[in-house]
Amino acid sequence: MASTTLSIATTIRSSSPLTSASTHHFLSKPTAIEFPFRLSSSSSHRAINLRPISAVEAPEKIEKIGSEISSLTLEEARILVDYLQDKFGVSPLSLAPAAAAVAAPADGGAAAVVEEQTEFDVVINEVPSSSRIAVIKAVRALTSLALKEAKELIEGLPKKFKEGITKDEAEEAKKTLEEAGAKVSIA
C-alpha cells in the first residue's frame, strides 16, 4: 500500500505544471488557474421590479401625491402636518372627540351626546424661585427626565407637563407638584 501511495504522489507531482523544477524557478510568479466554467453574459441574474399588490386601486392623482409624500424627510413631513393643521384649523386633540361623536349612535338628533373627558393634561403654570429645586425633584420623580431636561421644563412657563393621562394620574401629579410649590392646572 505504501508503494501505491508513493507512486500516485509521484504521478501527481510530475504531472503538475507548477512543480516542475526544470521550467519554473521558485521565485517566478505562478500561472493563474482558470476555472473551466464561466457564466455567460446572457444568463445574468437581474432583479425584476414588481408593482406591489394593493387592496384598493387608487387614481393616478392619489398615487402621485402618495409617492411625493413618501419621499419627504421627517422634517418636511412635520412641516407638512403643521401646515395642514393651520390651513384646516384642526389639532390632533380636536380630532379625538369628533371621532367619538361620529361613532356614537344617532337617536334622530333628539338626545344630545355628552362626552366625558377621559384624557387630561397637566400644565405647570408657575414655579416660585424659592421652590425651583423642589419642583425639579418632583418633576424627575414623576417622569424619567434627566436633570437638565427637568430644569428646562420649568423654565418659560406655562408648559404642559404630562399629556393624555387619566384623571387619577393627573390629580396625583398635580398634588405632588403643588406640594413642591408649583402652581398647576389640569386641562
Swiss-Prot record:
GO cellular component, one term: plastid large ribosomal subunit
A single BP term in Gene Ontology: translation
Gene Ontology MF term list: mRNA binding; structural constituent of ribosome
Alphabetized InterPro entries for the sequence: Ribosomal_bL12, Ribosomal_bL12_C, Ribosomal_bL12_C/ClpS-like, Ribosomal_bL12_oligo, Ribosomal_bL12_oligo_N_sf
Xref: SUPFAM superfamilies: ClpS-like, Ribosomal protein L7/12, oligomerisation (N-terminal) domain
Pfam family, one: Ribosomal_L12_N
UniProt keyword list: Chloroplast, Plastid, Ribonucleoprotein, Ribosomal protein, Transit peptide
Record keyword Nucleotide-binding present: no
Gene3D superfamilies (UniProt xref): 3.30.1390.10, Single helix bin
Segment annotated as transit peptide: 1-54
Membrane spanning residue stretches: none
Places the protein is found: Plastid, Chloroplast
The family this protein is said to belong to: Belongs to the bacterial ribosomal protein bL12 family.
The protein, known as: Large ribosomal subunit protein bL12cx
Organism: Arabidopsis thaliana
